[in-house]
Swiss-Prot record:
PROSITE patterns: 25A_SYNTH_3 (PS50152). Residues 1-355 are cytoplasmic. Does not have 2'-5'-OAS activity, but can bind double-stranded RNA. Displays antiviral activity against viruses via an alternative antiviral pathway independent of RNase L. Signal peptide: none annotated. Interacts with OSBPL1A and ABCF3. It is a single-pass type IV membrane protein. This is Inactive 2'-5'-oligoadenylate synthase 1B. One of its GO terms (molecular function) is nucleotidyltransferase activity. Highly expressed in the brain, liver, spleen and heart.
Length: 379
């Protein structure tokens, strides 16, 4: 598969992507099973535990929900939001007991012969794991979907998406994350926002993300771990498209090359968005500025400012950057006449707004003038 991708000319990349779309029949079958699982998780999950609780909602994430699946391979997240989790600490300390209940429910579904796909729950799971993993596969087809089921604190409640969340949500997250000493443990709480961030993007961009993910899987097969998380490359692709012009129709090879060139410049990456949070709230602003001063690469989760998706994994980035540099010489980045594809002009960092010292200086001058004026009258 690697030989096939790197050998085709740049003009054929769109056709290559079409070949690697999931089959419609399996996708429809998968959607039906996911809907059944969501209903079961919503109505029956944790009702028979020692302390029965209500599931407020079930969020769907992963590539199967984002529309960026690969043929024969996909991943999905089912986030079970529980009413009994009233803070981040509850999610951290009590998720094990509820994940056991979820596992029991999945075993019941596994025994149901009316479901047209095979469910395989990973036996190596332990209560300390953040998620329960299982696989769905079609017996008559070489296709599977990897799932993670995660119990979570319903932080956002019934926030109307795409409305920007109340910044106090993030202030509370930052405060509790700091007191618990846990880095990026609560990204599951923001699944719906993460999904919205990608879902409204044009189809062509999702196809480019699919191509980048396919390339990443080839690298993983060749290099093994450690590598940067796949989500970091998805965000990097969105960033490249945004800074490259936000076109609904574009040259796929140019977009692909831009992403790989950004990977080779990983030591310079400083990327964040202000779609869900920004610098207006003083506590959030202070925390954001600290996050953005961390050693690069920095790619903040657009839904969760505590999550640096680029992570502290310089070795993984170095290995992936080496592979990206090698790929830039391959035919998939050349036109039929041999001329190389030019990347988009995309900066490696997003500017950080300066703190409003000027306003404070004006206030100070105004205060001094008032003292001088009223001081003279008082003499």
């Amino acid at each position: 598969m690697e030989q096939e991708l790197r050998s085709i000319p740049a003009s054929k990349l769109d056709q290559f992507i079409e070949v690697h779309l999931p089959d419609i029949s399996f996708r429809d079958e998968l959607r039906e099973v996911i809907d059944v699982l969501c209903i079961l998780l919503k109505n029956r999950c944790c009702r028979e535990s020692s302390h029965p609780v209500r599931t407020s909602k079930v969020g769907k994430g992963g590539s199967s929900r984002k529309g960026t699946t690969l043929k024969g391979w996909s991943d999905a997240d089912l986030v079970v939001f529980l009413d009994s989790f009233t803070c981040f600490g509850d999610q951290l300390n009590r998720r094990g007991e509820f994940t056991k209940e979820i596992k029991k429910l999945l075993f019941e579904v596994q025994r149901d012969r009316h479901i047209g796909v095979k469910i395989e729950v990973h036996s190596s799971w332990s209560p300390n794991h953040r998620a329960l993993s299982f696989k769905l596969s079609a017996p008559d087809q070489q296709k599977e979907v990897k799932f993670d089921v995660l119990p979570a604190y319903d932080l956002l409640g019934h926030v109307c998406i795409p409305r920007k969340p109340n910044p106090q949500f993030y202030a509370n997250l930052i405060s509790e994350r700091t007191s618990l000493g846990k880095e990026d443990e609560f990204s599951t709480c923001f699944t719906e926002l993460q999904l919205y961030f990608l879902n409204w993007r044009p189809t062509k961009l999702k196809s480019l993300i699919r191509l980048v993910k396919h390339w990443y899987q080839l690298c993983k097969e060749k290099l093994g771990d450690p590598l940067p998380p796949q989500y970091a490359l998805e965000l990097l692709t969105i960033y490249a498209w945004e800074r490259g012009g936000r076109l609904t129709k574009f040259n796929t090879a140019q977009g692909f090359r831009t992403v790989l060139e950004l990977i080779t410049k990983y030591k310079q990456l400083l990327i964040y968005w202000t779609v869900c949070y920004d610098f207006q709230h003083p506590e959030v602003s202070k925390y954001l500025r600290r996050q953005l001063k961390k050693p690069r690469p920095v790619i903040l989760d657009p839904a969760n400012p505590t999550g640096n998706i680029a992570g502290s994994n310089p070795k993984g980035w170095r290995r992936l950057a080496g592979e990206a540099a090698a790929w830039l010489r391959y035919p998939c980045f050349k036109y039929k006449d041999g001329f190389p594809v030019c990347p988009w002009d995309v900066p490696t960092e997003v500017d950080i707004p300066s703190q409003n010292y000027f306003f404070h200086i004006i206030c100070l001058i105004f205060w001094l003038l008032l003292r001088l004026i009223f001081g003279k009258h008082s003499v």
